[in-house]
Amino acid sequence: MLQVYLVRHGETQWNAERRIQGQSDSPLTAKGEQQAMQVGERARTLGITHIVSSDLGRTRRTAEIIAQACGCDITFDARLRELDMGVLEKRHIDTLTEEEENWRRQLVNGTVDGRIPDGESMQELSDRVNAALASCLELPQGSRPLLVSHGIALGCLVSTILGLPAWAERRLRLRNCSISRVDYQESLWLAPGWVVETAGDVSHLDAPALDELQR
């Protein structure tokens, strides 16, 4: 049975400032660096063999810190990027106009084909993150990969594995540097395919972590 660990990046400057990141970027805070080191300490005990990361800066840095702890190489995969939030990226969430807030709500509340102008839909996000996960099935027997990605992207992935719509990710609380695990099982008795073993574990962190845009 293949076990895949899913890690959200460490806290960033824009997380702390309540700014919308999407595929734009901001650096890890000192707290975010510490969170990544604590993930690394946990990862060292898990037998991780591969690290696959979104190619955005905040995930790259998180993956680098984890890789130093567990001695793994990193592969970068753009399919693990965060949801493209279009024209709302870099904006402070409390400064959105009524129209802009409506765009955001339509997207995250599951409106069919909802998207922010110049951004992507939840279905497009779901398609690419699930394809990235499926690539883990091509790794050598005995592999145990760890994927470093983003809050909405990982929430979407876990939701769809559970058979829920992609926008159900808003019902999952995946805090900065939380660890989730999904397994691929082939069984005559259990549901074949991907199953969720754990989601949003923060027991390795020594201080409270942020949810998406939450203080």
From Swiss-Prot:
PANTHER family the UniProt entry points to: BROAD-SPECIFICITY PHOSPHATASE YOR283W-RELATED, HISTIDINE PHOSPHATASE FAMILY PROTEIN-RELATED
Annotated binding of substrate, by residue: 8-15, 21-22, 58, 60, 82-85, 104-105, 151-152
Catalytic activity: (2R)-2-phosphoglycerate = (2R)-3-phosphoglycerate
This protein's UniProt keywords: Glycolysis, Isomerase
Family matches, as NCBIfam families: PRK03482.1
Catalytic residues, chain numbering: H9, E82
InterPro entries the record matches: His_Pase_superF_clade-1 (IPR013078), His_PPase_superfam (IPR029033), PG/BPGM_mutase_AS (IPR001345), PGM_Phosphatase (IPR050275), Phosphoglycerate_mutase_GpmB (IPR023086)
Coiled-coil annotated spans: none
EC number: 5.4.2.-
Site (Transition state stabilizer): residue numbering on this chain: H150
Pathway: Carbohydrate degradation; glycolysis; pyruvate from D-glyceraldehyde 3-phosphate: step 3/5
Class in the EC hierarchy, top level: isomerase
Disulphide bonds in the chain: none
The protein's name: Probable phosphoglycerate mutase GpmB
GO cellular component assignments: cytoplasm
CDD domains the UniProt entry points to: HP_PGM_like
Species: Citrobacter koseri (strain ATCC BAA-895 / CDC 4225-83 / SGSC4696)
SUPFAM superfamilies: Phosphoglycerate mutase-like
GO MF annotation, one: phosphoglycerate mutase activity
Presence of the UniProt keyword tRNA-binding in the record: no
Family per record: Belongs to the phosphoglycerate mutase family. GpmB subfamily.
